[in-house]
Amino acid sequence: MIQTLKTDSSFRLCFAAIAFGFVFIMNGKLSSGTTPHEFPVYIFYLGERKHDDPNLVTQSHLEILKSVLGSEEATNKSMVYSYHHGFSGFAAKLKPAEAEKLKKHPEVIILLENRKLGLQTTRTWDYLGQFSTPTSSKSLLHETNMGSGAIIGVIDSGIWSESGSFDDDGYGPIPKHWKGQCVSADQFSPADCNKKLIGAKYYIDGLNADLETSINSTTEYLSPRDHNGHGTQVSSTAAGSFVSNMTLLGLSSGSIMRGGAPKAHIAMYKACWDVEGGMCSVADVWKAFDEAIHDGVDVLSVSVGGSALKTLDVEIDIAIPALHAVNKGIPVVSPAGNEGSRSSSVINVSPWILTVAATTLDRSFSTLITLENNKTYLGQSLYTGPEISFTDVICTGDHSNVDQITKGKVIMHFSMGPVRPLTPDVVQKNGGIGLIYVRNPGDSRVECPVNFPCIYLDMEVGSELYTYIQTRSSMKIKISPYKTIIGESVASKVAKSSARGPSSFSPAILKPDIAAPGLTLLTPRIPTDEDTREFVYSGTSMATPVIAGIVALLKISHPNWSPAVIKSALVTTAMKTDPYGERLTVDGGNYKVADAFDYGGGLVNLEKATDPGLVYDMDINDYTHYLCSQTLYTDKKVSALTGNVNNKCPSSSSSILDLNVPSITIPDLKGTVNVTRTVTNVGRVKSVYKPVIEAPFGFNVVVSPKKLKFNKTRNKLAFTVTVSPGSHRVNTAFYFGSLTWSDKVHNVTIPISLRTRFIDNFFL
């Protein structure tokens, strides 16, 4: 029998819980013990190192700090970190007035506050065409010997070295260029490393300096060992070794789990700690960058980020150390963020960072709900227990007396957000035997225990089921254990949680860059996990190591490619469809076709990326052009950043629209605009490319010249794209198109995003 708490308004009550849920989580976020310290940590960035000797660099930092604090004792007590390997800077505990005074020192380029950042599989590689068997057919994976010789640096929450994903059976010697080490600390020693895990360090001073109560060994491992689990999953996704017969209580039983570059080496830099689900101090993350650059990593996977930016990211977070890594040939891969489908929520927007959006896989863990008339509804669940025979259902939105109504029943609960006031634990505690969540499509992360029937229905299906049940005086449902559905019938989508472009502070730079699978990835579980729910991870932080693994393969295949060339190869060969040819859509209530602000160039196509034909390259001059365009950098600051007195900001006539990124985005088109790009031929020496234009709706797009002819002496050519508003005479939303250069073998495609802005400060 269907029951309700309020017979005349139960459906409204189901939705009423939404407001309470948001207020509760916003007001209850911070826990005791994480109160900021009275002397905040500030980061002072000084640019490129002026000395090769790190000791001399550190001494110069102490002298700068002493110029404000006066005594050597106060200086040593204040210093948290000296960044002296990959770049020059330091972190120090100071009073705000002292920090402001030090900001005026002539060697200080930028002063940053020490923000707190958050931590943002089996089927993944089959889905992308890299089949998960050690003996499968020829591919990029095998041409690169599965990434052997590459070192992937991971800045995250640590690593559980005993996992089978980090077994070194069959590995060759550690690369000669490696200069890192495995430190000895709390329940971790150099013996925990091997030829797979070749480096492991940790950084906590920045976070502890900002907390009233320091993190201690009762709640965390004060070592590279992973207590949170996130770092272990990220590492295994990027470069995990082959693990046969991987299973999660029957889920994907018999699968082979591996990372993107299964024979690549891993170096873990633990800078994130198990506080409030995962907290990373910017000061600690910078130190991890500093040492990773020095140690000799080939790729950096950094699955961290803050909330949507209220300022340029070159003033906060990871952009500056990432620039130094990229300038030294190390690609930096980071997430777009998990703040959902709202516009301008993307993070890590600097053009030198490879920013990753998340998509779903062609896999669904599905459970059947059967009515007494045999009508069925399909929901998502990881429930592996026995079938629940026909039983009563109750719909509730106000669970104040849930203890009186749930016993022996299945609860149907409507929710429109990721935070739910009614949890499986509460239902179980009060005798309920199942829970059906009805919520908007896209909240696909599976967060329920596998031993309790906890099923997700989207709002449309849930409303249909609710309406159907309400018309019956007596209705029961049956719940079946999950079944895995794989293949073309499961549509691939951009995850609802994946943050969207454009960046509100640099809208002319398209972000995110690329998309990769990031939802419901099956990864290793560390023994400290309380249950099996953490085995299944989702988010852009899981999509990030997918791309990092692919980048490692490309570095082995093309050792001379710059980070910008690698990004270009990924973006220009990406797919606008899933591997089955269906257009990618957006996971969420609007069901729209995905566009460049959802996925950048599209879904990664790693086999095409190894032979892109043409590439859009960039170097430090392009990146300083970007910095200068934001009016943050003077000639003096640019010279300090690059370590070259001859490097200066470009002339005032140079437009940010001409930055050689593999995209064209014009956020404020008022008339005709010319945009230039330069492409480098990395394909057949003698080749001819012709343009194919898909103009955004209502805009005119013309390309000149009409052909690009490459030969031995001409492997780099420029072209101009002329854009005009066409039929548009009002402020528009963004419209999307593309430009493809084709030689009938390669199709080198960049996205075009255009918006008119005839009236300033006018909101549509």
Curated annotation (Swiss-Prot):
Glycans are attached at residues 76, 216, 245, 374, 674, 711, 747. One of its GO terms (cellular component) is extracellular space. GO terms for biological process: pollen tube growth; proteolysis. Its EC number is 3.4.21.-. Coiled coil: none annotated. Belongs to the peptidase S8 family. This is Subtilisin-like protease SBT3.1. The lineage of its organism: Eukaryota, Viridiplantae, Streptophyta, Embryophyta, Tracheophyta.
